[in-house]
Swiss-Prot record:
InterPro entries: Nucleotide_cyclase (IPR029787). Homodimer. This is Uridylate cyclase. Mn(2+) 2 binds at residues 58, 102. Its main location: cytoplasm. GO terms for biological process: defense response to virus. It is an enzyme of class 4 (lyase). Pycsar (pyrimidine cyclase system for antiphage resistance) provides immunity against bacteriophage. The pyrimidine cyclase (PycC) synthesizes cyclic nucleotides in response to infection; these serve as specific second messenger signals. The signals activate the adjacent effector, leading to bacterial cell death and abortive phage infection. A clade D Pycsar system. The pyrimidine cyclase gene of a two-gene Pycsar system, generates cyclic UMP (cUMP) from UTP as well as cGMP from GTP to a lesser extent, has little to no activity on ATP or CTP. Expression of this and adjacent effector MePycTM (AC A0A1C5G2D0) probably confers resistance to bacteriophage. The genes are probably only expressed in response to bacteriophage infection. Mn(2+) 1 binds at residues 58, 102. It is found in: Cytoplasm.
Amino acid sequence: MTEVDLKALLADVDGDVATELASKPEVIDKGHELDISTLPIQARKWHKLRDAVAVVADLKSSTQLGLNKHAASTASIYEAATGGVVQIFDEFDANFVAIQGDGAFALFWGDKRRQRAVCAGITIKTFSFKHLVPRLEKKWDGLPETGLKVGLGSSPLLVKRVGVPRTEHQEPVWAGRAVNYAAKAAQQADRHEMVVTGTIWDWVSDNDFLAVTCSCSNPNPDLWSNITIEKIPDGDGDREGKRLTSSWCDVHGPEYCAAVLEGKKRRADVTTQRTSALAAEMKSWVRNKAAQDRKNRLARYQGLH
C-alpha cells in the first residue's frame, strides 16, 4: 500500500520552488552542437541551442481507433504508426526523439538540421498516405478516418534534464517555441498533411526541390498553400505558415530528397517559377508583414550571439 506524508511532500516541493526562484540558473550557450547525454539533473544549469527544428507527428482520430476493437488490434495500430514515425526520424539522424501516446516528436540541430527535418516530415506524410493508411483500411472495415498529421517549427531552445535524481523518472525539458509551435501546426493539419511555421517556410521557399512541383509535368510553384496557424499568437510572424498536401513523387522523390540532404537548392528545369510565386505572395500585406517580423526577429537572435 502506498503511503504518503502529504504535508511533508508539499513542504518539500515548495522548498524546491523557493530555491529555484531565489536566483537565476546558469545558461550555457552551446551554439549549434549539444550532447544530451551530458545534461545535468541536479546542477542549476540550462544549455542553450541557438537554433533547433522540431517535427511533430500526430495520428488523426487516435482516440476513436480503439472503439469496438480488441486491445491487441489497437496496440497493433499504434505500433504500426508510431514505430514507422520513429524509424523515419532515426534514418534522418534526429538528435532527439520522444514518443507521446499516438505520435512522436523529434528535434534536429547542428549541420543540415533544416534539410534533415523537412525531408523527415515529408517522408512521414508519404508513409502515412501511401503505406500506413492503405494497410490499415485493408485490414479493418469501418476504420475512422485516420492518418499522420505533421507540423514543423524552429527556434532557439533551452534544455535541462529534470526529474528525480538516481531514478528513471527524469527527462530533458525543452523550453522554447519550436516544439510548441510544431505541435500547434500539426494540430491544424489534416491527415497526410504537413503544416510549417513561417520561419520554416522562409527556408523551404528558397529550395527548388521543395518549393516547386517535380519534372513529371511543368514545374509549378503551387505546391504549398497559405495557412494561418490559429493557435500561434497574433503578431507572431510564425503564424503565417504553409500547408503541404503532396507526398514524395514515386519517380523523382528519392532524387529530390537526396539533393536536399546534400545541400543542393537549384534545379535546371526551374527558372522564375519560385521567385515569381514569392513576389506574388509578398503582395499580401499580412504575409509581407509576417515575413518582415521574422526577419527582424532573426536579426535580434543573431545580434545576441
